[in-house]
């Protein structure tokens, strides 16, 4: 079976991505088994769609470094126009290559970066779940959409979130997971959050975040700005 360890097909990991039956918050034995199988696939050669899909899978497995490696591989220029299972990459016009051309890798790449920065399945917003801390030490993202009809902006430095802004558009429950967030969040009424378990917090101590209500966390995990 060793010859299949790095095979591009990964349908046995559908429960990890795009579905969410397998997660770190669920059965940890199953999660670790999925992670082990995924890492055995490696970060090397593959088709465009497979490279894009593995970025998303590694994001769900919280493997930021492997996401980074796969992104670099997916953005490697290729000139092949023949069917080639080892020539995934991009053409000069930034179209994804299987090879030949397919759009799956382009969509998978962008979806994967979003998954690295924000995940919102299983009833919570997970902030920077797969940040490649040695490479993406500083950055910002605006306008990410989360399940529950939230809009999220994140700014980070030294590989730690500095500011998190969340806007609710539907008045649904808002639960955020990020180490240190419990002490640093204010809602529009300047009230602190109530900590549930030190990592997952009901923002503002409320069961639901009212429509249009904004939450702001400054200096997350450090000093409040």
Describe every region a protein language model picked out.
Residues 1-48, 71-91:
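Extended glycan-interaction surfaces of carbohydrate-active proteins
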Residues 9-14, 45-52, 62, 101-108:
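Aromatic- and histidine-enriched alpha-helix N-cap/loop-to-helix transition segments
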Residues 65-198, 204-210, 214-224:
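Non-catalytic C-terminal accessory modules of carbohydrate-active enzymes
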């Amino acid at each position: 079976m060793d010859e299949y360890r790095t095979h591009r097909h990964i349908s046995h990991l559908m429960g990890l991505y795009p579905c969410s039956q397998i997660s770190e918050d669920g059965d940890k034995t199953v999660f670790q088994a999925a992670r082990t199988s995924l890492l055995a696939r490696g970060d090397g050669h593959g088709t465009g769609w497979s490279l894009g899909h593995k970025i998303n899978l590694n994001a769900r497995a919280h493997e930021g470094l492997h996401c980074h490696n796969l992104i670099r591989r997916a953005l490697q220029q290729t000139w092949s126009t023949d069917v080639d299972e080892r020539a995934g990459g991009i053409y000069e016009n930034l179209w994804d290559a299987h090879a030949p051309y397919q759009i799956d890798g382009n969509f998978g790449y962008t979806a994967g970066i979003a998954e690295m920065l924000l995940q919102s399945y299983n009833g919570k917003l997970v902030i920077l779940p797969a940040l490649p801390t040695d490479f993406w030490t500083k950055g910002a993202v605006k306008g990410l959409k989360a399940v529950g009809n939230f809009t999220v902006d994140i700014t980070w430095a030294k590989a730690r979130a500095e500011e998190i802004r969340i806007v609710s558009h539907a008045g649904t429950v808002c639960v955020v997971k990020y180490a240190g967030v419990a002490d640093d969040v204010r809602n529009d009424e300047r009230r602190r959050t109530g900590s549930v378990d030190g990592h997952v917090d009901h923002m503002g101590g409320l069961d639901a975040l009212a429509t249009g209500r904004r939450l702001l966390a400054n200096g997350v995990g450090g000093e409040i700005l």
